[in-house]
Amino acid sequence: MAAHLNPLSAIAVPPARPDETYGCEGPEGPIRFVGLKRLLGAADFPKAGDRHAGLAAATETEREAARSILAGLTIAHLHQRPLCTADGRVDDVMRVNYDIDADVYGEIAGLTIGGLKDRLLAGSGEEALRLGRGLTGVTAAAVAKLCDIHELVLVARRIVHPTRARTLLGARGTLSSRLQPNHPTDDPRGITLLIWWGLSMAAGDALIGVNPAIDTVANVSAVLRLLDGIRRQAGAPTQICVLSHIKTQLAALEEGAPVEILFQSLAGTEATLTAEFDVTVALLDRGWEAMRAHGPLKDSAAQFMYFETGQGSEFSYGRHDGIDMTTTEALCYGLARRYDPFMINNVTGFIGPETHADNFELLVASLQDLFLAKLLGLPMGIGSCYTLHAGSGLEGQQATTELLAAAGATYFMDVALNTDRMLAYFDTSAHDNQTLREIHGREPAGEFLAWCLGRGILARDAAGAVVRGPEWGRPERFCESSEELAELVAATPALHGFETAGPRPADAVSRRVRFHQAVGRGAVHLPLDVERLRAIHPVREIATAAATHEAHLASPGLGTRPTGAALASLNAEPFAVQVLISDGLSAAAVHHNLPDLLPLLLEGLSAKGIGVGVPLVARHGRVKLAEPVGEHLGADLVIHLIGERPGGDALASRSLSAYLVYRVPAEQRGDAARASGNVDIRHEVTVISNIYSAGLPPVEAAAQIVEKTGQILACRAAGNRLEGMLAAKC
């Protein structure tokens, strides 16, 4: 555990410098790159996000020229040129990255980036860890861009950096997993079943962690207590976490909830971290201090923080400050390093084709992430994932995880049958984790292994090797009766069978899983039928800048902007609320939920005396389309009903979300800025998700949206600020 956190004011950062031109002679004349950001972007493997941002090299020749130039620059050259914001400021994420070991930096400052790569390849894992303490995220990213696949794997595999809570995570020879029992409505029965199933397959030694569908203090506290009770009942030596916003977790901790590991998603630019994630470095510092003083494991755990990252979030929000995806990801790791976390993992691939178009881009990015995080001294796990609207899939994910296991990934996810029932994406499973252990000769964390051996989940063969035991894959052993098991099963969607073949799902189970994925992929490409909506209620149609379905999928920013003609057709209206309907990534979600939801929503708003305009509908819309629409119409609140990306089973491809986008008035912006840390805040958002028949039924969703709309208008706040105000009144 770090003894203290350096004040940001005490971290020395070189002054900003004007952009310089880097160049070399090419076969057809000089090749030039203006600015270090442009050079770093051009030197990387080509990826969709960098291409869309105009940062990727145009040709392979240009890419290799950039790499050659970069290889010849010294560590000091990069160190002395912090990558700044558009207005020339060193943001707080960049500043934290300069909190390095000055002695190590002084020793290696004169090395070129190519020389650093050679030294890493020739040295030990211990030496790589030592050198990493003298590097910023930018410098680490530079050397990663020079590495081929073998080199990324080789260096990462050598580095071992264990951390400890209840279990020792990341010891040599181990491969752990985070058990992720997400449920679309946080139903305790479904969460319980998924935990029993994961534990029965020796998953969860890193963490049992739920991404909550409902991010309120009351719900997060309830889920934490559920996890705590299940862990105690099983006696499993692991730790628990609910991956809600850090503000929610800290409020739950203050109320006595068992927040054993504190979680937060990170971003590599302050603009993304603050404006999109509602987080500041000061807030992260406060969380670290609170856990050190009051965390349930404070007297036994050496570490207690957990972070998630992933290439592309800064680009997808349009807040990358001209920095490529690998470098912003490395800056996330430099920020995480400040808190000496118990665990950290990426979810590169979670966003979609706008950042990573295919399996190869995901493979390269994931290997870079592992290399970077381990070099910077972090206990790196991997969320090797894909979505159904991208050009990646299961076989590409499996090839990636094989290489990541060879490269020494600390842990993977356990998402049952690869299918996240709440977040609508696909990740590794307990079947995958056990398969990788058997292929690569790995074991769970030692304390957890002993528990598994004692339960018959794992066993030792005649030679002493760890093998699957007689109770492996039998979740019913944790239930008191067949009736209890049946009740848990009935409450859990996307259960295609418990049958196994060795460490893998039985073929009949795999066939059902793959069929449902195929149905989900089809839903992505279903066109929105506006006439079906008009049959429910009159609507006004507006167009977005995404002129085609292909452009909509590849460039989501287009779906956030109405066309000029669309805006010209709209005039300010005297209604506090507007309803906007978009297909998003599933027109099926709109078609199946709006017949029940929309009439009840409009009736409920009218019954509360809330004025609402004629609903608008947009093909190829994205979440942030609500902001310019609300601004143009002068609405206080836009209720954006939008199709979620398909995932889970075939039924889940009908899942809808309601984004309640509140336009913060000028007189409220001071309060909103103080609550969020974002001085430029203009909108606050409350989300109600997983609206479909097997999640939150549309009739119930309509009532929730009406209730939340009333709260937003009464309190003149939304999102985390609203929840804080509501909690203070209780």
Predicted regions and their residues:
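Long, compositionally biased, glycine/small-hydrophobic-enriched stretches that function as flexible linkers
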Residues: 2-160, 480-490
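Active-site loop/lid in soluble adenylation, ligation, and acyl-transfer enzymes
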Residues: 486-567, 725-728
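Active-site mouth loops of central-metabolism enzymes
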Residues: 175-190, 315-325, 386-395
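Hydrophobic faces of well-ordered beta-strands that scaffold small-molecule active sites
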Residues: 173-182, 205-210, 236-244, 260-265, ...
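N-terminal small/glycine-rich loop or linker at the start of catalytic domains
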Residues: 86-88, 92, 160-183, 303-318, ...
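Glycine-rich, proline-tolerant flexible connector loops at the mouths of alpha/beta enzymes
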Residues: 131-132, 143, 147, 207-225, ...
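C-terminal functional extensions of proteins
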Residues: 646-730
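Alpha-helix-loop-beta-strand connector modules within alpha/beta enzyme cores
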Residues: 154-157, 171-172, 177, 217-245, ...
